[in-house]
Amino acid sequence: VFFPQKSQVQHFTVYRKLFLDVAANSHSRGVANISQTSSISEQSIHRKVGFAKKHQYTLALLVILAIFGAAALYNLGYMSVQWDEMPHLYGAVMLTHGQTWDYMKTYGYYPPVFDLITTGYFQIFGATQVAGRLVAVTFSLLAIAVLFAFAKKTYGAKNALIACVLLGTMPGFFWLTRVTMLETMLIFFFTLVMFVFYSWITKDTYKTLIFSGLALGIGVLAKYQIIVAAIAMLLSILFLCRNRLKISLAKFLAILLIVVLVAVPWFVMVYQYNGATKFQTLQYVMTEGGQDRPAYSNRFQPIPIFYLIEMTWPFNDIPVNPISLPILVLGLCGLGLFAYRRKKQDIFFLTWFMVVYVFFTLIPNRQWRYVTTLFPILAVSAACFIMFLYSRVRLWKPKQAGLKGSRQKKLAAAFFIVIIASLVAYASYDTYKMTARDQIHIPIQEATDYLAGHLDQNQSAVVVCSFNLLSEDMFRFYLPYSMSRDQIWQYPDLPVDSFKPNFNITEFLNLCQERNVKYIILFDWGPHTTFFNTTLDYAQVQTMIYDTHRFGDPQDQPFFGDFANNKGYRLFLVRFLG
């Protein structure tokens, strides 16, 4: 009992040995598993780091797009609607309600792509001014992304990233991002056309050929002025395709054929909807515009420097510019560098800049928004000039050798980077000023909601003295679908800040009676601010109205808005007594 037999001792020894062997194997496998897990973790980290290094500029672009998008979306709906936004906002409302005939009859002279996309946004987000402005934000982000791809292909990722930063901080570009206008779509399609056409010149594939035609054709339906790209294409072929000139010209005709096939159906449709009148309207808008345009457009004549000054100083009230002056100078210096180097891509960008500049200089009606297609070109040229200067700083050899000379070189490089960063910050501040300048809220929606609840079907309201921030279409935009658009109208017919008004009080009274007016809509702007090309002001108009003793009911005088900063943005609804 107390002493095991010999066989039992032997079995115990065997079991003990097996147990120790299993434990040892388990320990070794555990160490191996830990080592393998650690190795896998290190490999994963290395892969992530490698991915980040490989795509560092693309990741930086995403950060830029996120910052730009957040800034563009901030308080997007606060600013009152601009006059030039209404054809697209109200036109999209018409299309949403299926009023195609009314749309074509009213806004048929505008290209359709922007309005169609705005209609789609209205279907998703609702018919609001924010939804309309989201279209502009979308195409601004797309324009920056396409510019990055194009500049990366031609000048490398660093230049591309700098170009995107410069474009995003251009005051005019950012301002256009926050309004429902065509220009951001124009910049996107123009940059896309440049990109795919340059790809066709360098590779000459049928894919890029067809895509060039499609991009230009759709671009024409987005903004008619993009047709100037066809001239730039032709000159680019003459300058860059001399070895295969005949074949390239023949293929260029194929591009034009694609453009015709894409765009002509729209013009045929426009012609069917009282097209002769619409084409005359389009010609008038392109060549003349408002009565205020000739004096503004003919500044600095006959010297063709209008747009050089216009792009950096178009406003008289505050020093705000569509392109910050230091960035414009860098861009022009970059174009000079292109002319000096004459690389293939340099000639391409320089050609497109000159074509756009000369073309729109020759058109009588001039404004900085017409040459927004130059913005991406100037952004690229400025980025190239910055990198050119930086390369010279890097190659600079101080007279003092050794550690002291190395420090001087590093200080010079750091100082250069600080200067460029300061210029970008200055451009960003200009962007803020230009955006803040128009942060005016006029309570049109609130007044329209009141009118919708207090007008019978046979009654109307009239906007007195419309201007850039107040028009009949702005009220119609907020009207319920059940109300007729004819229940809101304006007198005089044309805006008083762009056309010399003819305010005839007798005619005004007769129209109020004919259209069964219940309210006239008055705006609380500067009472002694004179209208265009006349000494007539708002105070005189109000005096003429009140002297008739046919307006004003003490029991019914609603108003909307607040009086702030010594300038009111209020709307008054004054009862017409008949």
Segments and roles (model prediction):
Residues 82-83, 136, 172-185, 367:
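Short acidic/glycine- and proline-prone juxtamembrane loop motifs at membrane-interface regions
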Residues 451-491, 495, 518-528, 572-573:
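Short periplasmic/luminal acceptor-recognition loop of GT-C membrane glycosyltransferases, typified by
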